Regions:
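Conserved acetyl-CoA binding element of GNAT-fold acetyltransferases
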Residues: 76-89, 118
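Conserved GNAT-fold acetyl-CoA-binding loop/helix
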Residues: 25-43
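A short helix-loop-beta-strand connector motif used in the catalytic cores of GNAT acetyltransferases and
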Residues: 43-56, 65
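Conserved acetyl-CoA-binding loop-helix of GNAT-fold acetyltransferases
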Residues: 87, 91-106, 128, 132
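Conserved catalytic-core motifs of GNAT/GCN5-like acyltransferases
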Residues: 118, 134-152
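Conserved beta-strand in the GNAT
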Residues: 62-72, 81
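Conserved beta-strand-loop-alpha-helix junction that forms the acyl-donor binding cleft
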Residues: 116-127, 144
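Conserved N-terminal entry element of GNAT/NAT acetyltransferase domains
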Residues: 1-12, 153-165
Length: 165
């Protein structure tokens, strides 16, 4: 048995997804710190979720993270906004880094796209690890900066990083 594996997300887990999204560990570093209401989640799920590709990252067949990738276009460019949702109230650094590697393996298979991540400035662990996964800071002078920040509604307390795939 593989120690780590992936499993595609489907509509059957709509309530589990909301439960994981509302865990304190996820809200702590999210732009939205409030718990998401079921009705808002259902509305988002059946409208916006179609633009998102998500899969569970499993450890010994138990979900530890959800990898998310929102795909969208800006002019002639294809973008991916990537994120991780913890399925556990607490995570360890090894599992987090392994999940990021699995997520990056998926992202690196996408071609001719720009991938963006945003990291809460208070998240000391991730603020020190983005460079090891091929990301660079998205500077304010970059042509994409204003569009990405506004389109994705990224708050002032977040840094944006990107890589060209």
């Amino acid at each position: 048995m593989k120690k780590f594996s992936i499993l595609e997300i489907n509509n059957k887990i709509i309530n589990k997804y909301l439960f994981y999204k509302n865990l304190h560990i996820n809200r702590k570093y999210s732009s939205n710190k409030k718990k998401i209401k079921k009705i808002d989640h259902y509305q988002w799920w059946f409208v916006q979720q179609k633009l998102r590709k998500s899969f569970f990252i499993l450890k010994k067949n138990q979900p530890i993270f959800i990898s998310t990738s929102d795909h969208f276009k800006f002019k002639k460019y294809k973008f991916i906004y990537s994120g991780l949702i913890s399925c556990l109230p607490e995570t360890n650094l090894f599992d987090l880094l392994r999940a990021i590697k699995i997520q990056n393996d998926y992202l690196n298979k996408q071609k001719k796209k720009y991938c963006f991540i945003s990291i809460d400035k208070n998240n000391k662990v991730l603020m020190h690890h983005w460079k090891y996964f091929g990301y660079s800071p998205l500077e304010k002078s970059n042509n994409f900066y204003k569009y990405v920040k506004n389109f994705l509604n990224i708050g002032k307390n977040f840094n944006i990083f990107y890589k060209k795939i």
